[in-house]
Amino acid sequence: MAGQRRGGRRRRKVDFIAANHIEYIDYKDTDLLRRFISERGKILPRRVTGTSAKNQRKLTIAIKRSRIMGLMPFVSEE
């Protein structure tokens, strides 16, 4: 049949922040924050990045603070 998917186990994504023992997500650390932003400048969801809910909330706050302070763009430069 034409619309079937092949079965296979997906590898669980690892929380980058927890794996590297990062306790405080600083809004000034733009190199870290850029890992969690798409090419268009949007914050990537948990299902893509693999971060925990707690760390995703911290990331979102840090990214928004960084944008307001002018360290990161709101949209990508095309």
Curated annotation (Swiss-Prot):
Q: Which UniProt keywords apply?
A: Ribonucleoprotein, Ribosomal protein, RNA-binding, rRNA-binding
Cite the GO molecular-function annotations of the record.
small ribosomal subunit rRNA binding; structural constituent of ribosome
Mention any one GO cellular component term assigned to this protein in its UniProt record: cytosolic small ribosomal subunit
Gene3D superfamilies (alphabetical): Ribosomal protein S18
Pfam families (UniProt xref): Ribosomal_S18 (PF01084)
Supply the PROSITE patterns for this chain. RIBOSOMAL_S18
Q: Which InterPro entries match?
A: Ribosomal_bS18, Ribosomal_bS18_CS, Ribosomal_bS18_sf
Q: Name one GO biological process term.
A: translation
Keyword Oxidoreductase in annotation:
no
Matches recorded under PANTHER family: 30S RIBOSOMAL PROTEIN S18, SMALL RIBOSOMAL SUBUNIT PROTEIN BS18M
Q: How does it assemble?
A: Part of the 30S ribosomal subunit. Forms a tight heterodimer with protein bS6.
Q: Which family does it belong to?
A: Belongs to the bacterial ribosomal protein bS18 family.
| Entry function | Binds as a heterodimer with protein bS6 to the central domain of the 16S rRNA, where it helps stabilize the platform of the 30S subunit.
UniProt-recorded name of the protein: Small ribosomal subunit protein bS18
Native source species = Levilactobacillus brevis (strain ATCC 367 / BCRC 12310 / CIP 105137 / JCM 1170 / LMG 11437 / NCIMB 947 / NCTC 947)
